[in-house]
Regions:
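Conserved short submotifs of the Hanks-type protein kinase catalytic core
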Residues: 154-167, 171
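Activation segment signature within eukaryotic-like protein kinase domains
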Residues: 186-187
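Activation-segment/catalytic-loop signature of the eukaryotic protein kinase fold
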Residues: 149
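Conserved N-lobe beta3->alphaC-helix segment of eukaryotic protein kinase catalytic domains
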Residues: 111, 116-138
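Conserved N-lobe ATP-binding subsite of Hanks-type protein kinase domains
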Residues: 99
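Amphipathic regulatory helices of Ca2+-sensor modules
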Residues: 385-386, 416-432, 459-470, 495-507, ...
Length: 546
């Protein structure tokens, strides 16, 4: 009796018969034999000391989770069928790059934004690949996250975080003019994101404008305070201060473009010019460089020709006028940097930083306790926590943990050093020089646990996944979602080859460690990890951390 098919509602359902079950069992047996044969071949590694192998400081993982501290392992091309995993709800925006849609993840019922980019040429294809690789390495609370992407012969489909407050352009259109305190809160976040881009990744965004700043919520500290995130790195560029940065064509949006970009010789300061334009618009309600036509506008931009309305000058603070002037200096060498902008007196007028990083002392203590208790049992646990945290920005506790991270990361570069951690503990918890030794001891212990990739600092998501209340990670649907990511062929089980692909294991020592990991979870010894085996393993680990 052979296998047969039947069609129901345009979907093919495979009817498994006895012959198929026998064939499947035979294939499984061959797979298992291959896996365990490989284990025998590399078992000798345990018996021979490796003189060149030096265990990494603070790491209990048998092989590195990531190669460079980025998120290559959890942000990947989804090889499944887009329509089977996402429901397209409605269009959100359209531009020269393509379209953006609101979509819903069918398994976890969470809304996402989907950016659809046509593949028009080989050059466009390579540019999209560059954008994806770039987004994989960006980890900042004020930059929208990339979750995964699909690709076919005609288009890329980038699945990103969805912020339901719309973009800043629409908010400006509805409000017309913002108070200085509200403008300060918005600009504080944009400058923080740019410090991270400019100093940590040597990255110029090149298209800072209200349409590329999205609102993800109103801050509870005040009804006129909006939490925002930066989007669209499609024309961004890595820069080198020692080299001339130029482009074959002028890119950016007319009203926000810096004069040096028009001369095709620019650096990261072109983003600061755009910020000056946005700040002007927020508090005045019009563009600083208006004109009767495009040439008139470009002429005013090149000469930095703008004025403040008399009504604004009468009521505006000297600090905001000065910051706008500092951002709109024609000479980029004289223009303020993102770091200096964030330290400008304007932001001290309204306690902007205090609003942005505010959390209760009880939450701060709870976070530190979670950090101290954090323990990594195996790579699969760490990858699971990383995947859940990265894909769940809507969880309120994650937002609060981002604030705690910002409290400690004083230079706002998105990389918490051991010294910053120690100073933060001293300032917010130990509160006194007599406790310096205790703060240093605690900072060392926490830092060595969290810096698993040994790059010398703690990134935001490393901090969040260690500090989060682990009860939030026990949800069966959330763990099913993560299991589905690991189960690349969607057959309901995780194989050795799938783990090898996820962890990018390429040497024989790491293959042995990976095989040991699989065998420690594979209770029925079938060479695969079922969801129940994975789920029970994760529950046991999470319960031990609560």
């Amino acid at each position: 009796m052979g296998s047969c098919y039947e069609t129901r509602a345009d979907k093919t359902k495979f009817i498994i018969d006895e012959d198929y079950k026998i064939k499947r069992a035979l294939v499984r047996a061959i797979q298992n034999y291959t896996i365990y044969k490989k284990a025998q071949q590399i078992q000798e590694i345990n018996d021979q000391p490796d003189e060149n192998h030096v265990p990494k400081r603070g790491s209990v993982l048998p092989f590195p989770l990531t190669n460079s501290g980025g998120y290559e392992k959890i942000i990947s091309k989804n090889k499944g069928v887009l329509e089977e995993e996402y429901q397209i709800l409605r269009p959100l925006a359209e531009g020269g790059y393509g379209q953006v849609y609101l979509v819903k993840h069918l398994k976890i019922q969470k809304e996402r934004a989907m950016k659809v980019i046509p593949i028009k040429s080989k050059n466009a294809d390579e540019k999209t690949d560059e954008e994806i690789e770039l987004l994989k390495n960006l980890d900042h609370p004020n930059i929208v996250k990339l979750f995964e992407y699909f690709c076919d012969d005609e288009k890329y489909y980038l699945i990103t975080e969805y912020c339901d407050g719309g973009d800043l352009f629409n908010l400006i259109r509805n409000k017309r003019v913002f108070s200085e305190s509200s403008a300060a809160y918005i600009m504080y976040q944009i400058f923080r994101a740019l410090i991270y881009c400019h100093y940590t990744h040597h990255l110029i965004h090149r298209d800072i404008k209200p349409e590329n700043i999205v609102v993800y919520r109103q801050n509870k500290a005040g009804e006129d305070l909006y939490d925002v995130k930066l989007i669209d790195f499609g024309i961004s560029k890595i820069f080198n201060k020692l080299e001339k940065n130029n482009d074959s064509k002028i890119r950016g949006s007319l009203n926000y473009i810096a004069p040096e970009v028009l001369q095709n010789n620019f650096n990261e300061k072109c983003d600061i010019w755009s910020c000056g334009v946005i700040l002007y618009i927020l508090v005045i309600g019009t563009y600083p460089f208006n004109g009767k036509d495009k040439d008139d506008i470009l002429n005013k931009i090149q000469h930095g020709s703008y004025t403040f309305p008399s009504e604004f000058t009468k009521k505006a603070s000297a600090e905001i006028r000065n910051l706008i002037h500092q951002c709109l200096k024609v000479n980029p060498d004289e223009r303020i940097s993102a770091k200096d902008a964030l330290n400008h007196p304007f932001f001290n007028l309204y306690e902007t930083k205090e609003y942005f990083i505010h959390v209760t002392e009880a939450f701060l203590n709870k976070t530190i306790n979670n950090l101290k208790k954090y323990e990594i049992k195996n790579n699969l646990q760490e990858l699971t926590f990383q995947y859940i945290v990265h894909n769940s920005p809507e969880i309120e506790e994650i937002n609060l943990l981002n604030r705690v991270f910002s409290k400690f990361n004083q230079n706002n570069d998105g990389k918490m050093t051991k010294e910053e951690l120690k100073k933060g503990l001293m300032k917010y918890l130990f509160k006194g020089k007599k406790n310096k030794a205790a703060a240093e001891k605690e900072a060392n212990e926490i830092f060595n646990k969290l810096d698993q990739n040994n790059n010398g600092y703690i990134e935001c998501e490393e901090f969040v996944r260690a500090g989060i209340d682990k009860k939030l990670l026990k949800d069966r649907k959330v763990l099913e979602f993560t299991f589905n990511f690991l189960d690349k062929d969607r057959n309901g089980e995780i194989s050795y080859e799938e783990l090898k692909e996820v962890f990018d294991v390429k040497n024989i020592e790491n293959e042995k460690a990976l095989l040991d990991l699989l065998k420690s979870i594979d209770n029925d010894l079938n060479g695969q990890i079922s969801f129940e085996e994975y789920y029970n393993m994760m529950l046991k680990i999470i319960d031990g951390l609560i």
